[in-house]
UniProtKB/Swiss-Prot annotation:
Protein name according to UniProt: Putative hydro-lyase A1S_1268
Signal peptide (residue range): none
Family the entry assigns: Belongs to the D-glutamate cyclase family.
The keyword Phosphoprotein belongs to this UniProt entry's keyword annotation: no
Keywords: Lyase
Lineage: Bacteria, Pseudomonadati, Pseudomonadota, Gammaproteobacteria, Moraxellales
Transmembrane segments: none
GO molecular function, one term: lyase activity
InterPro entries xrefs: D-Glu_cyclase, Putative_hydro-lyase, UPF0317
Top-level taxon: Bacteria
Amino acid sequence: MYKDIKVDPAQLEAALDARLKIRAGFDKPTAGMAAGMTQVNMISVPRDWAYDFLLYAHRNPQSCPVLDVLEEGIYATKLAADSDIRTDFPRYRIWKDGEMVDEVTDAREIYNAHPDLVTFLIGCSFSFETALQEAGIEVRHIHDDTNVPMYLSNIKCEPAGRISGNMVVSMRPIPSHQISEAVKITARMPSVHGAPVHIGHPESLGIKDVNKPDFGDASRIEAGEIPVFWACGVTPQAAVMNSKIPFAISHAPGYMFITDIPDRAWIG
């Protein structure tokens, strides 16, 4: 649960402006947008699968930290005023029987055709990146204006009912002398994935080539930097693929919803 803290009106305006820009057709990764405001992942599944997914998220809180649940027919979240989850992500992925069949920038027609969908909004590691930057730790994909690299790991999630799959991890290259600070900062924010799940040695996670992510873009890793891996909110999409859920809608990896909640509200 987030702390109810005072929000700078300028930050609220920036978050609303970002949502309106996205609603109007902005179609790029959202890292660095409305800096300091929480961003979230999303997965919508049929009502018949919703309990299984809720249990899956409960059993795997580091990769699937649920920040809000929207019942069928509800498209506004308590996390943001004037919001519509059908239009306020830059890009959506449409899934049938575990296969991605389409990507769209406006999902209203699809939600209208599937009125039984229950939506889960999941914490996102973009929400601790401002804190990293304020500590003097460069966030490479923001600096380079690329998408964060994400990988399907060999870490098995705890199954629930019909749902199972492996954890997806995001990666940020961190100078070796700053890793302890990065761990300390992110560990205080478990609702947005918390501390890293792995440091260095990507092959230990089943990653054959760190320069070829499964989602997003590759990041430069400079001399003296170590790849650091965090649990990622794309994990539900891996579960959709593995479990062959009949129908689902998700955000496209890196294309998030921007809320009215400041990042610092999640600091424990």
